[in-house]
Curated annotation (Swiss-Prot):
Record field: compositional bias (Polar residues): 537-548
Entries under InterPro entries matching the protein: MFS, MFS_dom, MFS_sugar_transport-like, MFS_trans_sf, SVOP-like_MFS_dom
Gene behind this protein: svop
Stated name of the protein: Synaptic vesicle 2-related protein
Tissues showing expression: Detected in embryonic trigeminal ganglion and spinal cord.
Pfam families: MFS_1, Sugar_tr
Residues on Cytoplasmic side: 1-87, 141-156, 202-209, 260-316, 395-401, 446-457, 508-548
Similarity comment: family membership: Belongs to the major facilitator superfamily.
Location(s) in or outside the cell: Cytoplasmic vesicle, Secretory vesicle, Synaptic vesicle membrane
Keyword annotations from UniProtKB, A to Z: Cytoplasmic vesicle, Membrane, Synapse, Transmembrane, Transmembrane helix, Transport
Amino acid sequence: MEDDLFQLRHLPVVKFRRTGESSKSEDDNISGEHEIQIGPVQTELEAVELEDGTTVPKEFANPTDDTFMVEDAVEAIGFGKFQWKLSMLTGLAWMADAMEMMILSILAPQLHCEWRLPSWQVALLTSVVFIGMMASSSLWGNVSDQYGRRTGLKISVIWTLYYGILSAFAPVYSWILVLRGLVGFGIGGVPQSVTLYAEFLPMKSRAKCILLIEIFWALGTVFEVLLAIFVMPTLGWRWLLILSALPLMLFAILCFWLPESARYEVLSGNQEKALATLKRIATENGAPMPLGKLIVSRQEDRGKIRDLFSPQFRCTTLLLWFIWFSNAFSYYGLVLLTTELFQAGDVCSISNQRKAVKPKCSLACEYLTVEDYTDLLWTTLSEFPGLLVTLWIIDRVGRKKTMAICFIIFSFSALLLFLCVGRNVLTVFLFIARAFISGGFQAAYVYTPEVYPTATRALGLGTCSGMARVGALITPFIAQVMLESSIYLTVLVYSGCCVLAAVASCFLPIETKGRGLQESSHREWGQEMVGRGTHNVGATPSHSGSQE
């Protein structure tokens, strides 16, 4: 009894308010502590009022109870075996996304020659994939917020696998145009793997882990180029499409293990499922669960686009849309531009060809050579140093400055393409540019899930991904069509766009470095109460203390 009284003396002074009772009273101006009278009368409490007059939700009405939220459990359990498995599984989906994107720069010149396609049809073949992604990104985000992250991810991956294999059997241009568009529709949901992944990560390792999962993207691009080197000269592009679907097939087989996000379960009212998921993670990691009861967050409408434009997120949403647009516009533009530059030999060769009086036939083509594939591989390998640089600076200078630095260095590297240099120096310039634009993309993937609350996290990431696809949709007409008119204007467009993106990064109103994931768009009472001495993390699990 004495211990209980000792604990109560050290708790914040609170006043209990009855249902319907005004929060203002005549005693508000009286200084000193308010006594808590406990009598036999049962009174329904709707809130607790702290000394500063702030109201706490009724689930915290008893300050002596041990309670915890999902964020507290994730922090207590930490990073372990479960997260390593999740990294590998969601990484497969990420790797497949990269391969489907990388295949565009390989497939387009091949079909240009084999089917004698004009340049605008080649550009359209690339753009239709991004049209599908743009149309579906917000939809998959809404599905993930409404029905669960796992559900949205599984459906999108199976969809992509089906139409990806089917497109290998396309007999004519119109068929492959439609089927690749449907592939793009499915790929629009793959970024939700980042949402699912981030919601299982403790705060101190979240940025590093999300960046490290980007290794699968880099591996996917490298694997696609290596696959093309061996498959294209012998088996052709149809087999390349089939073999490129292998990571998706492996994911579809293993996805039965994939758990639903505990944060999503709590927000949707499935407290028991969320608790079961947390216990599963604790068991696999060999870590104790926090003592007490799992607090259910206030249930909110999920997946509502209007929430992205609430006063607290309106500026963030608009700036992020432009940042994601610029990232994809420049990244995929550089991928396509690399192929064009390697085929020409250098920038000056392209410039001289444009000045020639002899008109250029739009059906003229050149197949990619082994040397072209090798140089493409070298620039693709730049994803790794770009990832390492971002990994090193993102927790030192913050997410916003990291994105700004990457955009500025990319812009400078792109301007170096104005110089008339040989193939080797050109490869170095492209290597640096690709390293930093991919680093900026990776930083955006860290920042976006961190800045939005659970109720709109998947939708926020989905709409940003959709805006990225708008940039990717436009970029073939810059990197492939405008290039025929002016290489210098093409490079200037990409460089200027990223300078503006760097400015936008600096003006983002929220820095998420060292910030926990927000469960709600409202004030996070669970996290505040933890610091008041009522939370017991890391204690030995107790059946009597934990909610079953």
